[in-house]
Amino acid sequence: MCGRFTLFSEFDDIIEQFNIDQFLPEGEYHPSYNVAPSQNILTIINDGSNNRLGKLRWGLIPPWAKDEKIGYKMINARAETLSEKPSFRKPLVSKRCIIPADSFYEWKRLDPKTKIPMRIKLKSSNLFAFAGLYEKWNTPEGNPLYTCTIITTKPNELMEDIHDRMPVILTDENEKEWLNPKNTDPDYLQSLLQPYDADDMEAYQVSSLVNSPKNNSPELIESH
């Protein structure tokens, strides 16, 4: 799964790397060393002509949901079953997004009682993007609430020693294909959702301070 990540890169670097044409005011971007579910996170969609950077709440709420509690259970979506699940079938075809990040955290189980937090990043330290889906849900008051989920897949050789799932990190080319609204074939779209090349990634243990979303400082990414 993917339940925590970082995004502390410079705002201008995000705009440049992902070819953003329309974006929220820079003052609304808050670098984070501990992005957690239920927070409003930076996301990118394509409207058919432009890449747009905005915010969606992490934890997808389907349009048919009775209340927003289901969102806490839907922070991730399995790549292998997207086209089978009622919550993800339609957004797979028409509501895709990418989520910029510079690393993510996963907890490695050492024994039944012990788990240690690991930080996983690209060896290059470059920005990357998770594949995601988004949805619109209307609150009981009739206000629209836009939410998203991060897609996971089977682990690569690096991740399989840490966890049995990993977030889908898209290659540059697959980012474009994933965002392109003209792509509507579920089989093709799911073929883009592959484990990232382990040779280009690295992982190391970090402080247990990351366990709490309340903690958010540069020391969270320091090797422990």
UniProtKB/Swiss-Prot annotation:
InterPro entries for the chain: SRAP, SRAP-like
Protein's UniProt name: Abasic site processing protein YoqW
Domain writeup: The N-terminal catalytic Cys-2 residue forms a thiazolidine linkage to a ring-opened DNA abasic site. Glu-106 catalyzes reversal of the thiazolidine linkage; self-reversal is favoured by duplex DNA formation. Glu-106 is also involved in sensing abasic sites in single-stranded DNA (ssDNA). His-163 stabilizes the abasic sites by forming a hydrogen bond with the O4' hydroxyl group.
Record's function text: Sensor of abasic sites in single-stranded DNA (ssDNA) required to preserve genome integrity by promoting error-free repair of abasic sites. Recognizes and binds abasic sites in ssDNA at replication forks and chemically modifies the lesion by forming a covalent cross-link with DNA: forms a stable thiazolidine linkage between a ring-opened abasic site and the alpha-amino and sulfhydryl substituents of its N-terminal catalytic cysteine residue.
Species: Bacillus subtilis (strain 168)
Enzyme Commission code(s) on record: 4.-.-.-, 3.4.-.-
Protein origin, superkingdom: Bacteria
Residues where Thiazolidine linkage to a ring-opened DNA abasic site is found: C2
GO molecular function: lyase activity; peptidase activity; single-stranded DNA binding
Family membership: Belongs to the SOS response-associated peptidase family.
Highest classification ranks of the organism: Bacteria, Bacillati, Bacillota, Bacilli, Bacillales
Keywords: Covalent protein-DNA linkage, DNA damage, DNA-binding, Hydrolase, Lyase, Protease, SOS response
Activity control: Formation and reversal of DNA-protein cross-link depends on DNA context. Catalyzes formation of the thiazolidine linkage in presence of abasic sites in single-stranded DNA. Mediates the reversal of the thiazolidine cross-link in presence of double stranded DNA.
Biological process according to GO: protein-DNA covalent cross-linking repair; proteolysis; SOS response
Site (Required to stabilize abasic sites): H163
Coiled-coil regions, chain positions: none
